[in-house]
Structures are given as C-alpha cells and as structure tokens.
Design a protein with these regions (language model features):
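Active-site pocket-lining/capping segments in soluble small-molecule metabolic enzymes
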Residues: 1-17, 48-112, 128
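Active-site-adjacent beta->alpha loops and helix N-cap segments on the catalytic face
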Residues: 3-6, 32-47, 129-133
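Conserved thiamine diphosphate
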Residues: 14-29
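Short, well-ordered coil/turn segments that N-cap beta-strands
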Residues: 23-26, 51-55, 118-120
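Generic hydrophobic, helix-prone segments enriched in Leu/Val/Ile
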Residues: 24, 80-84, 136
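Catalytic beta/alpha-barrel core
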Residues: 26-35, 58, 123-125
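Alpha-helix-loop-beta-strand connector modules within alpha/beta enzyme cores
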Residues: 42-56, 135-138
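C-terminal/domain-terminus segments
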Residues: 115-117, 121-138
Length: 138
C-alpha cells in the first residue's frame, strides 16, 4: 500500500481502461497487509480517484512471528514491520505465533460498515504452511 506514488495512479488508470476496452478481468492483488484501517482508506482513495477495480487483500496466514518478520524483510514490506514491532515490542513475544484474526476482524467490520468499497476477497500467504492455515480456517 505504501508503494511509490510516481506513476501509480496512471498505471491503475491504464489497468481500469484496459479492463473496460478488452473486457479483461483485472483484479488488484496486494502483498500481505497488517493495518485494516490503512487498507480501507487506500481502497476508498482509489474509488474517489475513479479506480473501481476489485481488490483482493493479502493476509499473512498463521505462522511463527520470526518467520513472518523474515518474509516481511524479504518482500520489502517495510511499513508493515513497524506494525509488527508495535504489537510485539519485546523479545519474548518474538517467540510467539502470529495470527491474522485481529486484522481479519478489523477488515471485516470496516468493509461491512462501508459496503460501497471495492475490497472483494482476501487471499492468504501460507507462511506457516498450508496445513496450519487449513487447520486454523477450515
């Protein structure tokens, strides 16, 4: 969500126009996110600027916090690391597991409160493994 703004609006406008001209189904798919408020604000700002493409929000599945931090660094999800630091501020908490439940609850309530948004689905990054993800959300 914190992507460079240079050319971003033009790129998204091109994708929207392309989808209308070609009838191609274009979906905006995000990296894994941690802040539902920022996600919904971003989605609303897109709508205000005329970008009404459907959005699928990336969600980090249940995993060890150290694994999640590794993927965050590897994927360049810098601002998201700050959120993790704020929620897991001491070293002892680094040994715990991460669950996306709070993020999903917040995202749910924010999107249900504003049904005129373009967030359609979430997709999971199974950093803790497919089995763990399915056991948690099956």
């Amino acid at each position: 969500i914190e992507a460079s703004k240079i050319g971003l609006k033009e790129s998204l406008s091109f994708k929207k126009d392309f989808s209308q001209i070609t009838d191609a189904e274009i979906i905006l798919t995000t990296q894994f996110c941690f802040d539902a408020h920022k996600v919904v604000d971003w989605s609303n700002n897109l709508l205000k600027s005329g970008i009404d493409l459907p959005i699928h929000i990336g969600v980090a599945g249940p995993t060890k916090l150290t694994t999640l931090l590794k993927y965050s660094i590897d994927c360049g999800v810098g601002p998201s690391i700050k959120i993790l630091e704020n929620n897991y501020s001491n070293v002892g908490k680094l040994l715990t597991s991460y669950s996306p439940s709070k993020f999903l609850d917040d995202l749910s309530s924010k999107t249900l409160a504003n049904p005129n948004n373009n967030i359609q689905k979430v997709h999971f990054y199974p950093f803790g493994g497919i089995k763990e993800l399915l056991n948690t959300y099956n």
